[in-house]
Amino acid sequence: MKKLVSLLLVFLLAFGLFSGCAETQLETQDTTPTANAPTTLKSLRILAIGNSFSVDAMEHLYAIAAAEGVEEIVLGNLVIGGCSLETHVAKAQSGEKAYKYRKNQIGIWEEVSTEATFLEGLQDEPWDIITMQQASPVSGLANKYQPYLDQLITFVQDNKTNPDAKFYWHMTWAYQQDSTHSGFANYANRQQTMYLGIVNALQQEVEPTDAFVGILPSGTAIQNARTSYIGDTLTRDGYHLNNLGRVIAAYTWYAVLDGQPLYKINIDSAASTALTERDKKVIVEAVNAAITEPYKVTQSIY
């Protein structure tokens, strides 16, 4: 009898241990979705009031939105190279034909005009989303934002054709550590100093305004990706983004506007052919972390 009881106890213990292991395996199994949720966006009509950094950020945005199922896409970009908030205000108020106006309606960027006024771009479409940004040399200098930011917001509010248009702030990126850009001297030629300056400027000067419904944290997504195996290699000249950097920035914009976590890179364009599977994992990680923590660098696991 004692022998039978002992055998029964051994059996029960073994079964319990096995069941426990099975439960543990189930609990720790990776349940991360392998596909993105269906897009919440039926259309995207975006105008960037920017410079060459908005060109970088929007280069692949059409391809991404189309791959995710957005049905109507119209992108516009009012560009003056190196344009600051101060200069945008001056050109907007004067009506000077100072802008390159670029537009993408079919998946190809076209230069509509090389002598456009601010109003021509602003009033060309009933834009749903309008983005603003600061020139990179002064993007991390909080004292260079006002009064120009408020003046630009007021001008756009008074002249936009869609009363329901929403404003987003484009947080740009710090220069590559070996950049030779003259504006890098504003940050003692240190990438970390520039990044922290950008964060500080946004917290001090952009967030207190009630005009912006959100931040497009391209700068933090780029900084996150720099902590991965990719390293500090995301520009083509020390400050303008290369292909991978442009994809990261564009996915940051898309993920913010879609309002859902990113799980898979679906871009279907020439840009995607240069991306490895490991690159795509870094993009997903960097973008999601930037949206969750827009003012903090998140160390990559890759």
Roles of regions detected by a PLM:
Residues 56-146:
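Conserved SGNH/GDSL esterase-like catalytic core that processes O-acyl groups on lipids
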Residues 240, 244, 250-302:
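Conserved catalytic region of serine esterases and O-acyltransferases that act on ester linkages
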Residues 47-49, 78, 170:
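Short hydrophobic segments within beta-strands
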Residues 22-24:
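Bacterial signal peptide processing site
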Residues 1-4:
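Positively charged n-region of N-terminal signal peptides that target proteins for export
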Residues 16-20:
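C-terminal motif of bacterial Sec signal peptides marking the signal peptidase cleavage site
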Residues 30-70, 270, 283, 293-302:
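N-terminal module-boundary/linker segments of secreted carbohydrate-active enzymes
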